[in-house]
């Protein structure tokens, strides 16, 4: 009887992407950051979902709701700090991943690289909007300074800034829309990750030697699944 993972329409996709995927035999720990980014994204979406259940995107109560999460919600302090420090870890892994791509010439895979650039900008936008949400002094300052950069655009700059703010200054409308975008963007990022992997699997990964590895491939599972799990544990 044929293995179900090779015949079932859905499991077949997973099988070709994570189990029977032919991978170069010599990729180093620098290739671990892709899977670590996937883990970070999952942690951010899960912790963010629970935080959103208790957060209020109103200028009068936003800061109080964050305090309430830390003081009154069961393990709210842990969820918040996982989300905040998870974001820092996300960017550490992201810069390592991009750095490896530059060093080992991954930019030659144009489609994969371009989707990666879009992912980088999307993650930066999400992080910026998340920084604004607690509505402390630094949140207000950050929102004002970064959005004001758009006022440097000739002719339409001022109008554009006021359009993003939803008024003549950073206020309730700004906070509400930033929360809405901060909530939806991670799901868009997850969809872009799928496209990123789709393009990567079209060409195959590069390797530290920089030469084609078609003659020397090994299955992704168990070799690289174990390597990735070791990366998660570390």
Swiss-Prot record:
Q: Does the keyword Membrane apply?
A: yes
Q: Which cofactor does it need?
A: heme b
**What are the TM regions of this chain, as residue ranges?**
33-53, 77-98, 113-133, 178-198, 226-234
Entry binding sites for a ubiquinone: 201
A molecular function annotated in GO for this UniProt entry is: ubiquinol-cytochrome-c reductase activity
What keywords is this UniProt entry annotated with? Electron transport, Heme, Iron, Membrane, Metal-binding, Mitochondrion, Mitochondrion inner membrane, Respiratory chain, Transmembrane, Transmembrane helix, Transport, Ubiquinone
Q: Which GO terms describe its biological process?
A: mitochondrial electron transport, ubiquinol to cytochrome c
Pfam families, per database record? Cytochrome_B (PF00033)
The record lists the effect of residue 154 to H as: In strain: Isolate NK 4504
Q: What is the annotated signal peptide range for this record?
A: none
Q: Which family does it belong to?
A: Belongs to the cytochrome b family.
Q: Specify the protein name.
A: Cytochrome b
Species: Lepus alleni (Antelope jackrabbit)
Gene that specifies this protein? MT-CYB
């Amino acid at each position: 009887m044929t293995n179900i993972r090779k015949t079932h329409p859905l499991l077949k996709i997973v099988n070709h992407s994570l189990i029977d995927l032919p991978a170069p035999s010599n990729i180093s720990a620098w290739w671990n950051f892709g899977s670590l980014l996937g883990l970070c994204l999952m942690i951010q979406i899960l912790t963010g979902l629970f935080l959103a259940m208790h957060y209020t995107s109103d200028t009068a109560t936003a800061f109080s709701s964050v305090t309430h999460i830390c003081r009154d919600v069961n393990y709210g302090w842990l969820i918040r700090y996982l989300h905040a420090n998870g974001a820092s870890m996300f960017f550490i892994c992201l810069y390592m991943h991009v750095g490896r791509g530059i060093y080992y010439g991954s930019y030659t895979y144009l489609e994969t690289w371009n989707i990666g650039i879009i992912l980088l900008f999307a993650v930066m936008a999400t992080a910026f909007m998340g920084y604004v949400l607690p509505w402390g002094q630094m949140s207000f300052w950050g929102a004002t300074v970064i959005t004001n950069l758009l006022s440097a655009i000739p002719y339409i700059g001022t109008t554009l800034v006021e359009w993003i703010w939803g008024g003549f200054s950073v206020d309730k409308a700004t906070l509400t829309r930033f929360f809405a975008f901060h909530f939806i963007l991670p799901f868009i990022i997850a969809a872009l990750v799928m496209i990123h992997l789709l393009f990567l699997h079209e060409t195959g990964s590069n390797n530290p030697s920089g030469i084609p590895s078609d003659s020397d491939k090994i299955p992704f599972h168990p070799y690289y699944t174990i390597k990735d799990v070791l990366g998660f544990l570390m």
